[in-house]
Amino acid sequence: MATGHHLEMPLQVAVIGAGRMGGHHARIYASLPEAQLVGIVDTDISRAQALAQQYNCPAYGSIEALLAACPDLQAASISTPTIYHRALAETLLSRNIDTLIEKPLAPTVADAQALVALARSRQCVLQVGHSERFNPVVRALSKHRLEPRFIEVHRISPMRFRSVDIGVVLDLMIHDIDIVHHLVRSPVASIAAVGVAVIGRHEDVANARIVFADGCVANITASRLAMKTERRMRLFSPDAYVSVDYQKKAGVVIHKTANQAQLDIVRQQLAAEETPDLSNLDYTELVHVDQLEIDDQEPLKLQLQSFLHAVRTRTEPAVTGEDGAFAVDVATRITQAIAQHQRNDQPPSVLGTV
């Protein structure tokens, strides 16, 4: 990767996009000693100025104006609508500016792959803003050795009319596509999906069944038309069952007991020709329950700190461009399966397949 960043001085960073997420990026960068927020960009200059005033930095109406005023810019966050990601990122990466792009990386697989290739050719850090990777629950779960065989995820919330330029798959489900991929680390063998557009032209509710090459199956449901917010995951493996609540930041891991002899006795009894009476057996003696040790650190702050660390040390980011492109590819296959299902006008119980 390109070198030359001064190791002692704060990194000069900018935020492209002064909306809700851009505001959070600006807030965190302004609070970090390792960063110097040198500009906020938005085509709505008044919105950029309002945000910049809060954090005592200049505002710009275009990325070109930012680059002209800040020739030593080292890193930037892109938090604009997805359709602008590729053009903005190409402008930054072509100038060797390390870039963090809010999820999804790009609206299409071709755009995502082009950005990955450009970042690689320019030896730039390209990190994708899958902030759920930094959720305390996910970080706690990563400390456990798991071999997932089945994963079930529900991510539902009321319609907030944000990210309406994309459907619920690229808006919400993509978080779980990334997390599942992070846990499974196996190629996708097949995808089946169903979804429906209720408010706009993009799907607002979707369900996908992803089968991986290693045999693991993930069933993911996302909705932005629910009456409540819920973000839960259940994971089954040969040695453990996991249940986590992202929203409540809580989780439990249930392992098989270390008392293998006791397990073997129970298995022998169950395998016997005559069904044994095990009604007095205490099930809890066969398992070990671990509450996940979860902290209260802000995921987005951890994400930006990890990005700055990758920039400073010239190391691979926690969520790579390749990770982001994988998520876009799977999300695209899901939306294609949904479209195929709708074209076939099949009954709801039949899923479209890609």
Which sequence ranges carry the predicted segments?
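Short active-site oxyanion
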Residues: 35-39, 74-76, 125-126
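Hydrophobic residues in well-ordered beta-strands that form the structural core
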Residues: 61, 101, 126-128, 244
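Beta-loop-alpha module in the N-terminal Rossmann-like domain of NAD(P)-dependent dehydrogenases
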Residues: 25, 55-116
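Contiguous beta-strand/loop segments that form the cofactor/metal-binding neighborhood of enzyme cores
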Residues: 177-260, 293-297, 301-314, 350-354
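C-terminal helix-rich "cap/oligomerization" subdomain common to oxidoreductases
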Residues: 1-7, 65, 75-78, 292-294, ...
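Mid-domain beta-loop-alpha active-site segment that forms a flexible
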Residues: 129-136, 159-190, 203-204, 324
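A contiguous active-site-proximal alpha/beta segment in oxidoreductase catalytic domains
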Residues: 106-163
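N-terminal Rossmann-like dinucleotide-binding module
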Residues: 1-55, 180, 353-354
